[in-house]
Amino acid sequence: MSTDMKTSNKYMSLAAITLAFSFTFLSRYIWSPLMADVSGEFGINATQAGLYMSAFFAGYLVTQIPGGIMADRYQPKYILIACTILGGAMTALMSRITSYEMGLVIRVITGISSGCVMAQCSKVVALTFAPQERASAMGVVLASPPFGITLAQSLGAPLNQAFGWRTTFVIVGAVAVGV
């Protein structure tokens, strides 16, 4: 493989993992601009609405260490793809909730899928970039949180206003498939 092809591939990998990590933040923070409408439809109080974020982070927390172990043992690219697709599917599935409890379960599963992502991204950087390039590559990856949060906060309300909260969840979930 030519040097140009290797360079192109590593930057394509960097773009892919950055988008995947960004999606985890988009999917977790899209709840904020949709919260009022969902809460109104289901009679969810502020404490219950806050628990939707906590449910996500509970799932996220329990997969941090297993995600790192999987990154060391298996192909991180495939784990990253599976986690991103599962996260997208769960985000889209939020559009179909019929009860508060169903939403909690979906948010936990979304957190579980997202919790493995950072370890996979780190492993891809370690495998793809030379030691002297890794900090720069990780700098790009670590721009994902504010990027994903900015997308959620800036697009969530207009999408909700234009299409409703259910369709907004579907749109955000579909983004994962595109990643």
Protein language model annotation of sequence segments:
Residues S13-A46, G67:
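Extracytoplasmic
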Residues F21, M53, F57, T84, ...:
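Small-residue-rich transmembrane alpha-helices and their cytosolic helix-loop interfaces
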Residues F25, Y29, G111-A119, T150:
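Small-residue-rich segments within alpha-helical transmembrane domains of MFS-like 12-TM solute carriers
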Residues Y29, F57-I65, I149-T150:
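Residue-level signature of mid-helix packing/kink "hotspots" within the transmembrane helices
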Residues Y60, T84-T91, T110, V175-V179:
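MFS 12-TM fold signature
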Residues V62-E101:
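Conserved MFS/SLC helix-loop-helix module at the cytosolic interface between two early adjacent transmembrane helices
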Residues I106-P145:
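Cytoplasmic helix-loop-helix junction between adjacent transmembrane helices
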Residues V141-V179:
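Helix-loop-helix hairpin linking two adjacent transmembrane segments in secondary transporters
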